[in-house]
Amino acid sequence: MSSEDWDLFAVVRSCSSSVSTTNSCAGHEDDIGNCKQQQDPPPPPLFQASSSCNELQDSCKPFLPVTTTTTTTWSPPPLLPPPKASSPSPNILLKQEQVLLESQDQKPPLSVRVFPPSTSSSVFVFRGQRDQLLQQQSQPPLRSRKRKNQQKRTICHVTQENLSSDLWAWRKYGQKPIKGSPYPRNYYRCSSSKGCLARKQVERSNLDPNIFIVTYTGEHTHPRPTHRNSLAGSTRNKSQPVNPVPKPDTSPLSDTVKEEIHLSPTTPLKGNDDVQETNGDEDMVGQEVNMEEEEEEEEVEEDDEEEEDDDDVDDLLIPNLAVRDRDDLFFAGSFPSWSAGSAGDGGG
């Protein structure tokens, strides 16, 4: 019984102890909350804390150095909206292109060099073209054409009769062969004035020998002559020849007169004086002929330079030797001299 009582008592006691513990715990929790409320006063408001700080600062002002405080306010710049990737602004694209072009212009060229040319403007030359440019600069300049393209040219086809009826005075100064034609080409210049630039070329047609092809170059700088000399087309006017001395008479009467002349001591010998004058005239004529030959040779050389590229043939100007020889033959004969005859008569 006692054990059962104990067991029942233990059960009742255990139940009563659990209920008391729960009540005590709940009461204990209420006591703890009340204690916390009593021990922790509510926090003071913010303005009171700030006022206490101000009071502390005011109390410490006499002991602190005087300082001035400035407050600056910083405001962030307004944020620009980012450009849309799908449709960029044309102004932005234009600025980007300008920046790229400026950066490319600032870069020095790598394969380009500048050489000072002969002219005032600068030339950009690549490395491969440097040798070619130096070769071109080292070559001598081509000889300029003398009045080649500046004078007008007139070509006429005339017959023999019309060729001889030319009213201008011409002088032939040379000729040269023509490629593909058996007839040579004759060159004439105006003989009326020394400074006249008029020229004439005469050649016989290869198709019709009765037709002459006449090419006039340049213009006359003087009026047309009133009369034309018969030798104007071939050579210049030479000085008039000295009249030949007539041959002495071989009659017996003339021999007697000669003896009287030679025997007279007071009579001067006029025959020797005439012979000396004749020899002096021959020397003067020979000098004039030599001077004219030199002038013709110089003119042939000048005209050879002017006509060097006509018809793509070799320029070989042949001077007018035939006419010159004909004129020289006129003075080739020596005049008769009386000195030998006079000496023979005097000795007899």
From Swiss-Prot:
One of its GO terms (molecular function) is DNA-binding transcription factor activity. Keywords: DNA-binding, Nucleus, Transcription, Transcription regulation. Residues 75-85 have a biased composition (Pro residues). Residues 143-153 have a biased composition (Basic residues). Residues 228-242 have a biased composition (Polar residues). Signal peptide: none annotated. Residues 19-52, 67-90, 133-153, 218-320 are annotated as: Disordered. Residues 274-315 have a biased composition (Acidic residues). GO terms for biological process: defense response to bacterium; negative regulation of DNA-templated transcription; nitric oxide mediated signal transduction; response to gibberellin. Transmembrane segments: none annotated. It is found in: Nucleus. Residues 159-225 bind DNA. One of its GO terms (cellular component) is nucleus. InterPro entries: WRKY_dom, WRKY_dom_sf, WRKY_plant. SUPFAM superfamilies: WRKY DNA-binding domain. Gene3D superfamilies: WRKY domain (2.20.25.80). It comes from the Eukaryota. Its main location: nucleus. Residues 133-142 have a biased composition (Low complexity). Transcription factor. Interacts specifically with the W box (5'-(T)TGAC[CT]-3'), a frequently occurring elicitor-responsive cis-acting element. Belongs to the WRKY group II-e family. This is Probable WRKY transcription factor 27. It comes from Arabidopsis thaliana (Mouse-ear cress).
